Structure formats: C-alpha cells, structure tokens
C-alpha cells in the first residue's frame, strides 16, 4: 500500500495542462479549441512535432493562439534523446526556444542540455521548467534528488518523468513529491499512471493531460483527470 506516504490533509492546488501535439496548424487549432472548451489551466505547445518548424513559424503560431485564448502556454521543443521528435540540430532546437521563450509563460528546457545553451534559453524566458526524462528506468532516490536539486538551482520548476520497472519504483517518485515543492513528478506507463493523480495530492504544481491522444505513456485525458480530482477533494 502507498498511503503511508500521506501525512494529514493536503490541499490540491495543481493546475491541469493539456498537451497540444499536432504536426500542422489546422490540427493545432482544432485541438486548441477543445482545450478551451475543456477549460484547462495551461496548454503545452509541443514545437518538436510541428512539420518544418522554424522560429518564425513558432512565433506565428503563438501569436495566433493568443488571438484565440489567454490560457498560459508551456513551450516545449523536446529533444529525441528525451522522447521528443525535433529533427534538426541542437543549435536549431535551442534557437527556436530562445527566440520564443519571452512570448510564453513557461519554457521547458531539458536539464541535459548543454549548460551554455540551456542558460541562453533561461535568460530569455519568463519562467522555466527544467525537465528530466528517463524512458528506460527509475534511477535511485539519491540520483533523482540530485536531478531535482540541479533543476531547481537554475529554473523555477523541476519536472521528472521516469519509467517504473516495478511498483516500488513508483514509490521513489512519490517520496520525491513529498520532499520538494515546485516539482512535477511523473511515473510513466500503466504501472505508474496512478501517480498522475496522487502527484497533485502530494503537491505537484502541474499535471499533464491529453486533449486528444496521450502524449506520454499512462497519461489520462483532461476530463478523466478533472473528474477524479474533483471526487478526491472538490477540485
């Protein structure tokens, strides 16, 4: 059982983020309309899946989104190494983020990014999510604590998403959420899917949800997430 981790009553303060993962503008705005209807708190715009993405194209899309809604944006341009699809060079990937970071509320940049390139993005961003993804395993608590500390030393929020190989791995993630504020923690796949609900109870500031198709293994859709959180504590 996992509920030994819960100590007293905890207020659920998490925000629901709907991920937009579409390859073309037509589908981006179809999904955006759904996100608006679902009243998400944030939208994550995944630049790495957009065909022929450039800085100029990213700027245009962001400006068009602003004409539709004032929902805060989390801008992501995920590297292939951490589960993304950006097809070009690391310098191009960073330039697109750097050129557009000031236009959005949050910019997601991987902790593994070259330190100088990462800092260029941070310097241009309003606020940052420093992320770490491991699709092979859940590292030790000590290792992940170092990851979180490193991320929070340079950014506003830390995000870790790891693959559990057994149920005990999911407890590692939950314990981290108990220890840290400003940590988004996700244990992936069906085995870890329950952490997407317990995470908000333990203080995770954002929970990522699917507007249409899931963007990560084990991810719930917006309606399911909100319904469960409401039942748990009048969310």
UniProtKB/Swiss-Prot annotation:
InterPro entries named among the record's database cross-references: Aldolase_TIM (IPR013785), DHquinase_I (IPR001381), Type-I_3-dehydroquinase (IPR050146)
Assembly: Homodimer.
Record field: catalytic activity: 3-dehydroquinate = 3-dehydroshikimate + H2O
CDD domains, sorted: DHQase_I
Active site: 133 (proton donor/acceptor), 159 (schiff-base intermediate with substrate)
Residues annotated as binding 3-dehydroquinate: 44-46, 78, 196, 215, 219
Entry's Gene Ontology BP terms: 3,4-dihydroxybenzoate biosynthetic process; amino acid biosynthetic process; aromatic amino acid family biosynthetic process; chorismate biosynthetic process
E.C. designation(s): 4.2.1.10
GO molecular function annotation: 3-dehydroquinate dehydratase activity
UniProt keyword Metal-binding present: no
Function: Involved in the third step of the chorismate pathway, which leads to the biosynthesis of aromatic amino acids. Catalyzes the cis-dehydration of 3-dehydroquinate (DHQ) and introduces the first double bond of the aromatic ring to yield 3-dehydroshikimate.
Family the entry assigns: Belongs to the type-I 3-dehydroquinase family.
Organism for this UniProt entry: Methanosphaera stadtmanae (strain ATCC 43021 / DSM 3091 / JCM 11832 / MCB-3)
Enzyme class: lyase
Protein name: 3-dehydroquinate dehydratase
Highest taxon listed in the record's lineage: Archaea
Involved pathway(s): Metabolic intermediate biosynthesis; chorismate biosynthesis; chorismate from D-erythrose 4-phosphate and phosphoenolpyruvate: step 3/7
Protein keywords: Amino-acid biosynthesis, Aromatic amino acid biosynthesis, Lyase, Schiff base
Claim: 4Fe-4S is one of the keywords in the record: no
UniProt xrefs under Gene3D superfamilies: Aldolase class I (3.20.20.70)
């Amino acid at each position: 059982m996992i509920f030994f981790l819960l100590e007293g009553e905890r207020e659920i303060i998490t925000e629901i983020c709907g991920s937009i993962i579409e390859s073309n503008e037509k589908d981006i705005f179809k999904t955006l309309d759904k996100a608006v209807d679902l009243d998400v708190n944030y939208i994550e715009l995944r630049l790495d899946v957009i065909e022929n993405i450039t800085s100029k194209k990213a700027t245009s899309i962001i400006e068009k989104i602003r004409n539709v809604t004032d929902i805060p944006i989390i801008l992501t341009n995920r590297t292939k190494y951490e589960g993304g699809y950006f097809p070009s060079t690391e310098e191009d990937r960073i330039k697109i983020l750097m050129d557009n970071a000031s236009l959005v509320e949050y910019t997601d940049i991987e902790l593994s990014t070259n330190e100088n390139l990462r800092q260029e993005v941070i310097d241009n961003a309003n606020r940052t999510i420093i992320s770490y993804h491991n699709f092979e395993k859940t590292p030790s608590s000590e290792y992940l604590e170092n990851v979180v500390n490193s991320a929070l030393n340079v950014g506003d929020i830390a995000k870790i998403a790891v693959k559990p190989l057994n149920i005990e791995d999911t407890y590692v993630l939950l314990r981290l959420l108990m220890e840290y504020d400003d940590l988004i923690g996700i244990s992936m796949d069906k085995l870890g899917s329950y952490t997407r609900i317990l995470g908000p109870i333990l203080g995770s500031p954002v929970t990522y949800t699917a507007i249409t198709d899931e963007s990560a293994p084990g991810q719930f859709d917006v309606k399911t997430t909100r319904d469960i959180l409401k039942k748990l504590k009048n969310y």
